[in-house]
Design a protein with these regions (language model features):
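Outer membrane beta-barrel
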Residues: 20-36, 45-193, 202, 211-215, ...
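Outer-membrane beta-barrel "beta-signal"
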Residues: 350-366
Length: 366
């Protein structure tokens, strides 16, 4: 990350503050590589892909000292496709990843308003309870043979269905995150539906989460319910909750993760269990995990086994090269075809019960 002094020029004009009263930070993530997929609609494919190990982001974070241990804070983050430079999720969009402003106190915590992550992402992903966040990237998050889950405005109906990839944020939201209380951090969030005549419940989002860390052991839990205008006039949606545990042992750490996703209108539901291990020994970071995804009767009792292995080699403090492999096997109904998360396109689903992926890439942070 690169800090730059904007207080004397920009911030001072906008806020009347002196340079010592605040700061702004430019930050970003860049990832690109080449991926091989064994079966996309019955055919092999080799292609350029980006935003896999980490999403391609750039943004600004800023603070202004208010006195008494309090600060005003803001964050504006844009996502883009490195291959063509287009903004995501749609060309022309700006700061679509996060856009928030708020107040922070070391003693009381923070209150933020805007478009921001719910606690499935905050508590479980950023709490390092998911191997996908630590080494597996987008391909290691969950999708599988569950298109009937029917998430609105979702490219496959089940892409990132438990929300841990952070691909879905909460607009029009108010979020409280506590200070660190002897290792415990908790939070609450409410996202307004902004639907005239719909009351506070329609199209709304409610989320809560916590993380407790002591020594080498950590626990996390999170809940979110998102209601969509396409589902029962904004009174039904998707409900997610999850639990995570992490234990560090010398250069190794182990993680366990459980998530449950339910369509509150149709009753379709998926349970996920993941177990993983990571080794960190400079310049190497090596990780592997296994996850089992199981749908209920509304999803034809389809299931998927998935194994991911990845290795990163640090070229510097900011830049790494990496390799990754993912294998998924799907079962259940006759139409249960494997589909690794992040393999996109009209024929991206495997024509069979298995799909294998290998990737080589690089990432850098600033």
């Amino acid at each position: 990350m690169k800090k730059f002094a904007v207080a004397a020029a920009g911030l001072a004009v906008a806020t009347g503050a002196h340079a010592s009263d605040g700061s702004a930070t430019l930050f970003g993530l860049i990832d690109a590589g080449v991926s091989y997929v064994s079966n996309e609609g019955g055919k092999r494919n080799v292609y350029f892909d980006d935003g896999i190990a980490v999403p391609n982001l750039w943004g600004l974070r800023g603070t202004e000292n208010l006195g008494g241990g309090a600060k005003a804070i803001f964050e504006l983050t844009s996502q883009y496709a490195l291959g063509n430079g287009a903004a995501l999720p749609t060309p022309g969009s700006m700061f679509s990843r996060t856009a928030l402003v708020g107040l922070w106190s070391e003693r009381l915590g923070s209150v933020t308003l805007g478009q921001q992550y719910d606690f499935m992402t905050d508590s479980l992903t950023f709490g390092s309870f998911d191997g996908a966040f630590r080494y597996g990237g987008l391909y290691n998050f969950r999708q599988g043979p569950f298109s009937k889950l029917g998430i609105p405005d979702n490219p496959t109906g089940s892409f990132d269905f438990d929300r841990l990839a952070g691909s879905s944020r909460v607009p029009n939201s108010v979020k409280y995150t506590s200070a660190n209380l002897n290792g415990l951090v908790f939070g609450l969030m409410y996202g307004f539906g902004n639907q005239a005549g719909g009351g506070l419940a329609a199209n709304s989002t409610v989320s809560a989460g916590l993380k407790y860390e002591t020594g080498s052991f950590a626990l996390g839990a999170a809940y979110v319910e998102v209601k969509y205008p396409q589902m029962n006039n904004g009174h039904d949606g998707l409900r997610n909750w999850g639990l995570g545990a992490r234990y560090a042992l010398s250069a190794f750490d182990l993680n366990l993760l459980y998530t449950n996703t339910r369509n509150t209108l149709t009753g379709a539901a998926i349970d996920v269990i993941q177990a993983g291990v990571r080794y960190v020994g400079a310049p190497w970071t090596i990780g592997a995990n296994y996850e089992y995804m199981k749908g209920n009767a509304q999803l034809d009792r389809n299931y998927a086994h998935q194994v991911t292995a990845a290795a990163q080699y640090a070229l510097s403090k900011r830049t790494s090269a990496y390799v990754e492999t993912v294998y998924q096997y799907a079962g259940g109904s006759a139409g249960a075809h494997a589909w690794i998360n992040g393999v996109m396109g009209p024929d991206a689903q495997s024509s069979s019960r298995s799909q294998f992926l290998a990737r080589i890439g690089m990432l850098t942070r600033f």
